[in-house]
Structure formats: structure tokens, C-alpha cells
Amino acid sequence: MRIDKYLKVSHLIKRRTVANDVADAGRILVNGKAVKASYAVKVGDVIEITFGNKPVKVRVLAAEGPDRKDVAREMYEVIE
């Protein structure tokens, strides 16, 4: 799954277009490297998002999943 879609489905960012813009601005790092919106997310990846005043760091637990709010939280674990 592309990182822009993953961020939307996991409810880390509300809209895919916003996730795309954040990635294009270089504010999404995966395993310490800036990535484009088309990056394919893999289980175990560490994603750092600098969005607004609060940076978020999460580890991917599931790279695929339904777009349902009740299971979105199970797709990642917050590191920082």
C-alpha cells in the first residue's frame, strides 16, 4: 500500500491529498529517509511525520487493512 493511502486508512492523517502534500514537502521519513507519496509501506517500517507542532513516530504493524476506524489503531504502534 502506498504511504499516502496508508496514512489515510490508518487515520494518522485525515485526507490522502494532505498526506500526499506532506510527503512532497519532505516531512515524512521512513526508516530515517525522506520518501515520496508512492513509497510502498512494509511491516516493520518506522514512519516519522512532522505535521503541525507535534511530530509523530510510529512502527507499521500491518501494511494492509480495511478503511474502518475501529481497526485503524491496530495498523501501527506509537513509538514517540
Residue locations for each model-derived region?
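A basic, amphipathic helix-loop patch mediating RNA/tRNA/ribosome contacts
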Residues: M1-V43
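Ferredoxin-like alpha/beta domains used as RNA- or RNAP-binding modules
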Residues: M1-K5, A34-K36, A40-E80
